């Protein structure tokens, strides 16, 4: 039997998609396939697509068309495959297989069938699979960072969101399964673990009958990983036990990613998030009171159907009042198969874009003030890269999550994928700058200061 084909992957979309990519690569590598980082040289290219909003679909389509024009054999996976399976197979004869969001664990069988001349469609109507610690992973992040999925799918039905249609209802892994994988990652030298799902604060509700994030955090506190970061915390799910677990578990960073989406009760009601409008202020105040050093990231949608200037002004005042550390702003994207697609009045795209730009301008002085407060402090920094031309080190402090927040640019020497003390010397809107301070090298996995 000849050599097995080489396979490359083009990863698009979110961290959840990244984990799917890593599991597919892990399964293929385990089965003896060679993983090639060069798409031009690989026999097959898996394109793990995103379909969350129009912009993401356009990026996925561009990637697919470029590969098709290069006459590559394409395996399409991910959310766009789940969403537009028939259209993709019809429009792209170069697509030799299409794999749904609940079927990526079959990738070895898919490739084998393709090798035998079959054009494969492996898509479950309702995704139900979630990978556990027994499914191999070929990690694509830097050595010191790993994402850890605690649950898949979503039981909520926000009016703008197509995710439940693409990834199914929530299904949680057991605490034991998650902790076992965390230990595996610790053994690989991971310094930062990022917990993800659609709604991390709802973790365990489907499996145990009640949310179990607080218990999970305390168990992860026993694993030798210096930083544990929480993403996708639904604001109304931040209960007192969860806040206490964050405060009392040394390796859990006081960093919360809270996708609030809006502040005005009427818009939140239209978004089908009505309960949130009554608790936004109180939740944020409660977090800051319980965890004064908390770093808060949030995202907002502007231009949602029916959003008036009054609604937008409410959001601007909300951002000014609470002074979030990091803010992301998206313009509304009308997605078919969501209630918001048919809602009226739709906000003109130019007005939505203008509101986005204005809200980002409002946030900028807040962001730079937060960063300038770090000047003079010695903070822990996870060193992830080195500029080969200048020798400058690049990393992140606990204030910064990968890809969405800023970076710390460091003068001095330190090994990659280690956490070292860095004295911050100056700051700009998004990033910090400093120099290594290796005389002060204790307990930096435990605090933000």
UniProtKB/Swiss-Prot annotation:
Residues in MTTase N-terminal domain copies: 5-116
Q: Where does [4Fe-4S] cluster 2 bind?
A: 154, 158, 161
Tell me which EC number(s) this protein carries.
2.8.4.4
Which is one GO molecular function term here?
A: protein methylthiotransferase activity
Q: Which UniProt keywords apply?
A: 4Fe-4S, Cytoplasm, Iron, Iron-sulfur, Metal-binding, S-adenosyl-L-methionine, Transferase
Q: What is its main location?
A: cytoplasm
An example GO CC term for this entry is: cytosol
InterPro entries to which the protein is assigned, alphabetical: Elp3/MiaA/NifB-like_rSAM (IPR006638), Methylthiotransferase (IPR005839), Methylthiotransferase_CS (IPR020612), Methylthiotransferase_N (IPR013848), Methylthiotransferase_N_sf (IPR038135), NA-bd_OB-fold (IPR012340), Ribosomal_uS12_MeSTrfase_RimO (IPR005840), rSAM (IPR007197)
Annotated SUPFAM superfamilies:
Radical SAM enzymes
- Cofactor(s) for this UniProt protein: [4Fe-4S] cluster
Residues forming the TRAM domain are: 372-438
GO BP field = tRNA modification
Residues annotated as binding [4Fe-4S] cluster 1: 14, 50, 79
Q: Which domain of life is it from?
A: Bacteria
Q: Radical SAM core domain: from which residue to which, for each copy? A: 140-369
Q: Which family does it belong to?
A: Belongs to the methylthiotransferase family. RimO subfamily.
| Job of this protein | Catalyzes the methylthiolation of an aspartic acid residue of ribosomal protein uS12.
Protein's name according to its UniProt entry:
Ribosomal protein uS12 methylthiotransferase RimO
């Amino acid at each position: 039997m000849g050599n097995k084909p080489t396979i490359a992957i083009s990863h698009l979309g979110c961290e959840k998609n990244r984990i799917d990519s890593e599991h597919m690569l892990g399964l293929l590598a385990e089965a003896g396939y060679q993983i090639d980082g060069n798409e031009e040289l690989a026999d097959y290219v898996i394109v793990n697509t995103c379909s969350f909003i129009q912009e993401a679909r356009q990026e996925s389509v561009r990637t697919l068309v470029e590969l098709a024009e290069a006459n590559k054999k394409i395996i399409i996976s991910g959310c766009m495959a789940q969403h537009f399976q028939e259209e993709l197979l019809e429009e792209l004869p170069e697509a030799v297989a299409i794999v749904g969001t609940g079927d990526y664990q079959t990738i070895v069988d898919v490739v084998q069938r393709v090798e035998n001349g079959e054009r494969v469609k492996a898509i479950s109507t309702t995704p139900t699979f979630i990978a556990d610690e027994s499914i191999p992973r070929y990690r694509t992040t830097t050595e010191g960072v790993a994402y850890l999925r605690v649950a898949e799918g979503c039981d909520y039905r926000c009016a703008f969101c197509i995710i439940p249609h693409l990834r199914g209802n929530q299904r949680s892994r057991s605490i034991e399964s998650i902790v076992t994988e965390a230990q595996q990652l610790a053994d690989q030298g991971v310094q930062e673990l990022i917990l993800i799902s659609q709604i991390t604060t709802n973790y365990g509700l489907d499996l145990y009958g009640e949310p179990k994030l607080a218990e999970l955090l305390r168990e992860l506190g026993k694993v030798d990983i210096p930083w544990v970061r929480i993403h996708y915390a639904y604001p109304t799910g931040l209960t007192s036990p969860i806040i206490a677990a964050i405060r009392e578990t040394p390796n859990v960073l006081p960093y919360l990613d809270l996708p609030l989406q809006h502040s005005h009760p009427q818009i939140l009601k239209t978004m089908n998030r009505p309960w949130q409008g009554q608790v936004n202020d109180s939740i944020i105040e409660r977090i800051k009171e319980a965890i004064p050093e908390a770093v808060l990231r949030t995202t907002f949608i502007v231009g949602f159907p029916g959003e008036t200037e009054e609604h937008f002004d409410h959001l601007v005042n909300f951002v000014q009042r609470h002074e979030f550390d990091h803010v992301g702003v998206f313009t509304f994207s009308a997605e078919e198969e969501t209630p918001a697609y048919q809602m009226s009045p739709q906000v003109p795209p130019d007005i939505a874009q203008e509101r986005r730009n204005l809200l980002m301008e409002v946030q900028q002085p807040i962001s730079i003030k937060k960063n300038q407060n770090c000047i003079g402090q010695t903070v822990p920094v996870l060193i992830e890269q080195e500029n080969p031309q200048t020798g400058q080190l690049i990393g992140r402090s606990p204030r910064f999550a990968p890809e969405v927040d800023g970076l710390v640019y460091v003068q001095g020497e330190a090994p990659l994928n280690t956490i070292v003390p860095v004295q911050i010397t100056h700051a700009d809107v998004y990033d910090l700058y400093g120099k290594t301070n290796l005389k002060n090298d204790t307990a930096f996995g435990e605090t933000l200061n």
